Amino acid sequence: MKRFFAALVLVAVAGTALAQQGPKPEDMIKIRKAGFGFMAWNFGKIKANLDGNFNKDQVIAAANVVAATAGSGMGALFAPGTDKDVGDQKTRVKPELFQQPDRVKELMGNLSREANELVKVAATGDVAAIKAQFGKTGGTCKACHDDFRKD
């Protein structure tokens, strides 16, 4: 009986240790790409509404997704080991990103701030104001891409 409980404790401890390790670099790249891809798709929905038939509800919904994704802590997915291709996951991140954590934090903060402002402006339904804020929000994406994304 003691052996059983000792084995049970060992399994529990090992399981806890494995769970605390978090996702593997390959999985982090995959999740990161999915998150930014979903954000880009929602940016596209906003742009389509601004360029075509405007639907305030669609713009608000897409802006909320962008803001939620931007504020979700995706910066944690730029962890050690995710600076290069891993397994079948390719990354376009430049190695410099991992050497400038303060700049990355600043850029992610800018994205989150402008995306939250986009949500507020979208709620007004003012197309001109939404276009202006959409440009500011997209500019934060561009700033990061210019610094840290391979072409």
List PLM regions with ranges.
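Sec-dependent N-terminal signal peptides
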Residues: 4-13
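N-terminal signal peptide c-region/cleavage motif recognized by signal peptidases
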Residues: 14-19
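Sequence context surrounding c-type heme c attachment/ligation sites in exported
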Residues: 22, 26-60, 64-151
